[in-house]
Amino acid sequence: MPAYRSRTTTHGRNMAGARGLWRATGMKDSDFGKPIIAVVNSFTQFVPGHVHLKDLGQLVAREIEAAGGVAKEFNTIAVDDGIAMGHDGMLYSLPSRELIADSVEYMVNAHCADAMVCISNCDKITPGMLMASLRLNIPTVFVSGGPMEAGKVVLHGKTHALDLVDAMVAAADDKISDEDVKVIERSACPTCGSCSGMFTANSMNCLTEALGLSLPGNGSTLATHADRKRLFVEAGHLIVDLARRYYEQDDVKALPRTIASKQAFENAMALDIAMGGSTNTVLHILAAAHEGEVDFTMADIDALSRRVPCLSKVAPAKSDVHMEDVHRAGGIMSILGELDKGGLLNRDCPTVHAETLGDAIDRWDITRTNSDTVRNFYRAAPGGIPTQVAFSQEARWDDLDTDRQNGVIRSVEHPFSKDGGLAVLKGNLAIDGCIVKTAGVDESILKFSGPARVFESQDGSVKAILANEVKAGDVVVIRYEGPKGGPGMQEMLYPTSYLKSKGLGKACALITDGRFSGGTSGLSIGHVSPEAANGGTIGLVREGDMIDIDIPNRTISLRVSEAELADRRAEQDGKGWHPTEVRKRNVTTALKAYAAFATSADRGAVRDLNAR
C-alpha cells in the first residue's frame, strides 16, 4: 500500500519543525492525517482566460476541505499568446510551458503534496500542467476556466460572430475603415475565458476530456455560465476520492499514467483530428506523452490522420461557429460519441470520473442519453453581456443541435471531410514530418506548387506581405523560428492573418519550422522537422526554388536534386546553421538556456539534456 507522500512532513518526532510551519498556515492536529491536495491555480490579470480564476482556487479548496482533505493553493505563471504576438514577447510563450511544468513539480515535490487539482485555461498552461501531472504521477483532476463567449457585432446592417482573429485581419485590411476596425476590436473578445474558437487553449482543454483527466463539459462550457461552477465543486470532491483510492486502496486507476495510457492518447488525437484542433496540440500531446513515458509519436498521429474523418469545423475553420455552438451540439462527449459509433475510439480507458470512457460517453452523449440533467447542461448558452466574472449568467438555448448530418457535429457517415482535420506531411523538405490543419485549408489548394519566398524571420515575412511583395502562387518560407532557432518557436498568426487581409488566404502557402496560433487557417504548414537550426532541409531552400505540397498524399517536397542539396548542405555546414541576416532580437540568458536543450517539433520541442 503506498504511503501518503505528505506524511514525510507531517508524521514523526523529527518533523516537529515542519508541523510547526504547517500550523502557521492554519493546519490543526486533526489535519495531519488527511491527504494534502495542491490546488494549482494560474490566476493573472494579464490574461482574459485567467482573469476570473482568482477566487476559483479557493472555491475548489473549500470543497476539498469539505470532503476531508487539506487544500493548499499556489499559482503558476501564464503568458497570453495573443498579447505576446508579433514582438519578442512571443519568444517566451513555448518556453513558459516547461517553466510551468517545472514549477508545479518544484512546489508539489518540495512540499510532498499527495494529489492536485490543476486550474488551467490558456495556451501553454494546460500543456505545462499536463506534463507535470504525468511527470509526477499523483492523482490529478483538471478543471479549466472555460471559453469566452463569441463576439457579436452589427456592421452595415449585418450581424457577425467575431473572435480575436477577426480583429487582427480587419486591422490589416485597407478596405475596412478605422471606425469599423474599432467596432470589431471592441466586440471581438467580450468576456473572460479562453478565446472563443477552436484555438490552442480550447483544443487542449477539450483533449483533457478525451484523455480522461477532466470532467465532461470541461472543454466547452462557457466561462461565464453558472453551470461551469459545478465542475469546480465536483473537482474538489473528486480529487479527495482519487487520493484515498490510491493511497488507501492501492488503486492505480487513480493515477494519471494509468488513465493517460497510449490508448488514451490515441483517443485524444482522434478527437483532435475529428474536431480540427489547433496544430499546437500535436506539439503538446507529444510532450505530454514524453513525460508519461508513453510511446506515442508522429507515426501514430500520421496513422490516425489517415482514418479519422473531420466531424466538426469551428472558427477559424468556420468563422460563424464557436465553442458555445459546440457545447449546444453536445460538446466533446458527443464528438467522442460519434467516433465511438464509427469504431474509432478505445472505450475501455479509465477516467477520473467514470469506470471507462465508454461508460462516460453512454451517459453524456446527448444523442444516446435520456437524462434531462445532461441535456439541460448542454443547453447552457452565452449571456451576451460583457463581463470578467465567472458563473455570472444562466442563459439557455431553447433546443439542442442534434443534427448529425448538417449540424455543428457530424456523424462518421456525414463528415465535413473523410480526411481528418490535421495531417502529417513528409518529404525531403520535412524528413521527420510537419503538420497542417487541413480543416482550415480550402479544397482548391489541397495540392499546391509554387516558388519559394524565403525569410529568415517572421518579421521579414510580415514586412514583405504588407508591402505587397508576396504574390498569388508564392510559397512563403519562414525559417530559423523553431524551438532552438527562434528560440522559442514563435507563432505565425500575423503572417497568416495578413495573407488573408491581402486576399491571398487561398492563393499562397506558408511553410515554417515555427508554429501557428490555433487561430490560423489557410495552407499553413508548421513544425517542419528537423528545424533549420538543427540542419533541416528548410535551411537549404533558396529564393525561387519550387516547392510541391500534396495533402491528400501527405507529401511535401523541395524540387531540387539530391546532388544539389548535398552541395548546399556542405556549404551550409561550413557557414553554420543560423540566419544569414542580423535579427534585432533580444535573446536573454533564460531563452538561451531553453534553446540549448530544445528538440525539434517532431519530439514535442521537449528538452533533451543530451541535445548539445
Curated annotation (Swiss-Prot):
GO terms for biological process: isoleucine biosynthetic process; L-valine biosynthetic process. Keywords: 2Fe-2S, Amino-acid biosynthesis, Branched-chain amino acid biosynthesis, Iron, Iron-sulfur, Lyase, Magnesium, Metal-binding. Gene3D superfamilies: IlvD/EDD C-terminal domain-like. The modification N6-carboxylysine is found at K124. This is Dihydroxy-acid dehydratase. Its cofactor is [2Fe-2S] cluster; Mg(2+). It catalyses: (2R)-2,3-dihydroxy-3-methylbutanoate = 3-methyl-2-oxobutanoate + H2O; (2R,3R)-2,3-dihydroxy-3-methylpentanoate = (S)-3-methyl-2-oxopentanoate + H2O. One of its GO terms (cellular component) is cytosol. [2Fe-2S] cluster binds at C122, C195. One of its GO terms (molecular function) is dihydroxy-acid dehydratase activity. Mg(2+) binds at D81, D123, K124, E491. Its EC number is 4.2.1.9. Homodimer. Pathway: Amino-acid biosynthesis; L-isoleucine biosynthesis; L-isoleucine from 2-oxobutanoate: step 3/4; Amino-acid biosynthesis; L-valine biosynthesis; L-valine from pyruvate: step 3/4. NCBIfam families: ilvD (TIGR00110), PRK12448.1 (NF009103). Functions in the biosynthesis of branched-chain amino acids. Catalyzes the dehydration of (2R,3R)-2,3-dihydroxy-3-methylpentanoate (2,3-dihydroxy-3-methylvalerate) into 2-oxo-3-methylpentanoate (2-oxo-3-methylvalerate) and of (2R)-2,3-dihydroxy-3-methylbutanoate (2,3-dihydroxyisovalerate) into 2-oxo-3-methylbutanoate (2-oxoisovalerate), the penultimate precursor to L-isoleucine and L-valine, respectively. It comes from Rhizobium etli (strain CIAT 652). The active site is at S517. SUPFAM superfamilies: IlvD/EDD N-terminal domain-like (SSF143975), LeuD/IlvD-like (SSF52016). Binds 1 [2Fe-2S] cluster per subunit. This cluster acts as a Lewis acid cofactor. Belongs to the IlvD/Edd family. The gene is ilvD. It holds the Pfam family ILV_EDD_C.
